[in-house]
UniProtKB/Swiss-Prot annotation:
Ca(2+) 1 binds at D210, D212, D214, T216, E221. This is Mitochondrial Rho GTPase 1. It is an enzyme of class 3 (hydrolase). Mg(2+) 1 binds at T31, P48, D70. There is a cross-link at K166, K248, K585 (Glycyl lysine isopeptide (Lys-Gly) (interchain with G-Cter in ubiquitin)). Mg(2+) 2 binds at G441. The chain crosses the membrane at residues 606-628. It comes from Mus musculus. NCBIfam families: small_GTP (TIGR00231). GO terms for cellular component: mitochondrial outer membrane; mitochondrion. GO terms for molecular function: calcium ion binding; GTP binding; GTPase activity. Keywords: Acetylation, Calcium, GTP-binding, Hydrolase, Isopeptide bond, Magnesium, Membrane, Metal-binding, Mitochondrion, Mitochondrion outer membrane, Nucleotide-binding, Repeat, Transmembrane, Transmembrane helix, Ubl conjugation.
Length: 631
């Protein structure tokens, strides 16, 4: 890993400009330093104070505009000094190497004054500048080094001469570097080691870059890392040289010809100790970090415009990325993520994003572990319900870096307005939301869990505090794989506007409860009778004795009157997985809301949809097993 040609940083990667303030005792040469930099010669006549100088971005090494500000005690008040300190990004404290009084004032006046005027948690970086080195034969470093060790905010010390133009450009480069690539957040000089926040950030970067999850960065992974950070690959000999440096200092820094996490952290410690912390900062910023080593909002939440009546879905590239993420962490190749494997996956997150309810929202295996299909389903649900959170999660996984896209927004498809779908009588959507409505205890949970293939026996094992109000799984309609998202709507007198927004409604009543259907009928009349949202009535617990419903007309007559499909008998009290017929019907109705009620009542219509579902479920399963064998 070497710096090479640095990737052009985005505007959000670092500060938009740098403001350098020069302070110090009178006549130490502050103004001369600025004028020597600008004119490239020592000024014969020096004014009391130089005007503010702006160096354009195109002539600075870091391509950032730089403002240089002079301070004159004779011309400016204390209030003006305090204001300049508050506006500065870095402060150069200038002393004359031949003037002990000016050196003493560095610690007795200037550092305390600056620290009083800045926030304790975000101290300004300081540069100590020993001017007039042309007047002495000795160095002031022996005097200055103890000061540097005492104050961690001091980035570096530079001895220079405005008269001989010695180290003038270097001085301002170091000042600029102290702002854009500060040492403070990365390294603790007293302990001679990286700070915990830096180790944490670099560990996440290592985990993302270790694409086969074997605990080392092999040559291909190192080359990819080098290219995305520095826009240049490493020659085979250069790669070997890097590993040899690590081997020389660490017995466990290289394993199986790959760089271990310890070796990776050691390399960055070495960069920082050798004054090459811009290399580490380039890596950190490429992976989304700001100066405080937090992931930036611009990185986690890229701009994504979502017009009204549009939904959000993952596109093909996002699913490929998530499939590779699953494969990376499914170490035992059982097509499910164990708690330890899931924990390993979420190590690049600042928190565990999924609670125990997720295991009852998507498909799991017999041990309750999220399956391959369940994993993709949960991401589909998050994208649909809370796309900002999806962008955040993809950011933690390094989506834009590993796929070499501008941002996570490239993983999202924003569907067209639903009104256009209705006009054109076709939809391009792949995710359909079904609100499941009914009184408490009518069997809504049974409907949701049946979508995941769980019968009543399996449902009884679910703890109350682990229950989910959502369930999502794939459903095949006319040979097309779609996601059906069920949402259990709590019983209430009236539904909120948000509770009426969906693609299809499933009205559930309990055949053993005579008062159950009344609620379904009332909610239908209040909210859906005059809407264009298709509705399906489900007669739950159909394996039990049916009682007459206390309503003016029977459920069957109600459906006939309102031109709805007849009530669908449903039970989850089965030996095997419950029937998926109602889910095919619900998805079909969501896909084709314009289809006439006569068609919906036609057995031929449902037969075509169900036949397609059966054939493609079998084909899909066969393809899935083939993929697993390859994996």
């Amino acid at each position: 890993m070497r710096a090479g040609r640095v990737r052009p940083l985005r505007a959000s990667d670092m500060k938009k400009d740098v403001r350098i303030l020069l302070v110090g005792e009178p006549r130490v040469g502050k103004t001369s330093l600025i004028m020597s930099l600008v004119s490239e010669e020592f000024p014969e006549e020096v004014p009391p104070r130089a005007e503010e100088i702006t160096i354009p971005a195109d002539v600075t090494p870091e391509r950032v505009p730089t403002h240089i500000v002079d301070y004159s005690e004779a011309e400016q008040s204390d209030e003006q000094l305090h204001q300049e300190i508050s506006q500065a990004n870095v402060i150069c404290i200038v002393y004359a190497v031949n003037n002990k009084h000016s050196i003493d004032k560095v610690t007795s006046r200037w550092i305390p004054l600056i620290n009083e005027r800045t926030d304790k948690d975000s101290r300004l970086p300081l540069i100590l500048v020993g001017n007039k080195s042309d007047l002495v034969e000795y160095s002031s470093m022996e005097t200055i080094l103890p000061i540097m060790n005492q104050y961690t905010e001091i980035e570096t010390c530079v001895e220079c001469s405005a008269k001989n133009l010695k180290n003038i450009s270097e001085l301002f480069y170091y000042a600029q570097k102290a702002v854009l690539h500060p040492t403070g957040p990365l390294y603790c000089p007293e302990e001679k080691e990286m700070k915990p926040a830096c180790i944490k950030a670099l560990t996440r970067i290592f985990k993302i870059s270790d694409q086969d999850n074997d605990g080392t960065l092999n040559d291909a992974e190192l080359n990819f890392f080098q290219r995305i950070c520095f826009n240049t690959p490493l020659a085979p000999q250069a790669l070997e040289d890097v590993k040899n440096v690590v081997r020389k200092h660490l017995s466990d820094g290289v394993a199986d010809s790959g760089l271990t996490l310890r070796g990776f952290l050691f390399l960055h410690t070495l960069f920082i100790q050798r004054g090459r912390h811009e290399t580490t900062w380039t890596v950190l910023r490429r992976f989304g970090y700001d100066d405080d080593l937090d992931l930036t909002p611009e990185y986690l939440f890229p701009l994504l415009k979502i017009p009204p009546d549009c939904t959000t879905e993952l596109n093909h590239h996002a699913y490929l990325f998530l499939q590779s993420t699953f494969d990376k962490h499914d170490l035992d190749r059982d097509c499910a993520l164990s708690p330890d494997e899931l924990k390993d996956l979420f190590q690049v997150f600042p928190y565990i994003p999924w609670g125990p309810d997720v295991n009852n929202t998507v498909c799991t295996n017999e041990r309750g572990w999220i399956t391959y299909q369940g994993f993709l389903s949960q991401w589909t649900l998050t994208t649909y319900l809370d796309v900002q959170r999806c962008l955040e999660y993809l950011g933690y996984l390094g989506y834009s870096i590993l796929t070499e896209q501008e941002s996570q927004a490239s993983a999202i498809t924003v569907t067209r307005d639903k009104k256009i779908d209705l006009q054109k009588k076709q939809t391009q959507r792949n995710v359909f939301r079904c609100n499941v409505i009914g009184v408490k205890g009518c069997g809504k949970t049974g409907v949701l869990q049946s979508l995941l293939g769980r019968n009543l026996m399996r449902q009884k094992k679910i703890r109350d505090d682990h229950k989910s109000y959502y369930a999502i799984n794939t459903v095949y309609v006319y040979g097309q794989e779609k996601y059906l998202l069920l949402h259990d709507i709590s019983e209430s007198e009236f539904l909120t506007e948000a509770e009426t927004i969906c693609d299809v409604v499933c009205l559930v009543y309990d055949v053993t409860n005579p008062k159950s259907f009344e609620y379904c009928a009332r909610i239908f009349k209040q909210h859906f009778m005059d809407s264009r949202i298709p509705c399906l009535i489900v007669a739950a617990k159909s394996d039990l004795h049916e009682v007459k419903q206390e309503h003016s007309i029977s459920p069957t007559d109600f459906c006939r009157k309102h031109k709805m499909p007849p009530p669908q008998a449903f039970t989850c009290n089965t030996a095997d997985a419950p029937s998926k017929d109602i889910f095919v019907k619900l998805t079909t109705m969501a896909m084709y809301p314009h289809v006439t009620q006569a068609d919906l009542k036609s057995s031929t219509f449902w037969l075509r949809a169900s036949f397609g579902a059966t054939v493609f479920a079998v084909v899909g399963f066969a393809m899935y097993r083939a993929l697993l064998k390859q994996r």
